[in-house]
């Protein structure tokens, strides 16, 4: 049977830490808690489960803290939860079974990650696979009978275990601060972080957040030869221009995208702009484009229930205006269709 080290980094997690550890502690052969500066009862709560509690000076880098926690592990595999995660009874049983039968050649186990919708800042599906269990020591093996080479790719097992991510607040402001400091220090972001920064801005960013990010995304949009990065830049700029009520700037960006390969987010921002200009007829066309004619690249809601809610608002506004009998019948029918679509819409499963 494999042995597990739980390695967790924490800061001021007194409200959720016990809930997390209660759900997995009995499956762990050691529990390692790395505290990055708690001022509440986090460390006292952790002490009920382990004496392996270490302090780590926060340097604005989650990876550095996690690497430090991994250095303390001694078991076969490392399980790396966040304090606001929970394994329910059924998935606790699945992890217990996995521990009994886990083959030693498996180097990473992925688990399905499900976040409470209210505080979902990065997921565009009900669940997504994330690596959560890691073999502590990896051995290298040669492959191919001739022109042999060392296998570099890890052996990954996609399990059916579902981790419930249950945060009690948004962490966007913290994330934005780290993105900004990384850009200030290094000047660039990786492909992954470029997408994640744009995604969080589109999902939860307010005007202040977008204004701080504006110059970096403006430069990215103007200079990149990566079509995905250009698309991310267009989305962020469009939202920023719309929140600033800068119609000229919004149209300058959006019309370039609409002329080529528009995404749902740009259509959604155009729709919100026209709705703010008290033009529900024009807004409804762009909400419809966002929902049925384009695909979302950063925020699934812009091409899903968000666009449908916008359509509903447009039709309700129009029905409050003076209309011909034919127009009233048409918009009433469209409103009913939008309401039905809203009731049927669900996040993609994965």
Question: Which residues does each predicted region cover?
Answer:
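N-proximal low-complexity "stem/linker" segments adjacent to membrane-targeting elements
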Residues: 1-23, 350
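Acidic helix N-cap motif at the loop->helix transition within catalytic regions
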Residues: 15-18, 40-49
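A conserved acidic beta->alpha catalytic loop
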Residues: 23, 35-45, 58, 82
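Conserved donor nucleotide-binding strand/loop of the catalytic core
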Residues: 44-68, 72
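Short aromatic/hydrophobic "clamp" motif used to bind/position activated sugar donors
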Residues: 78
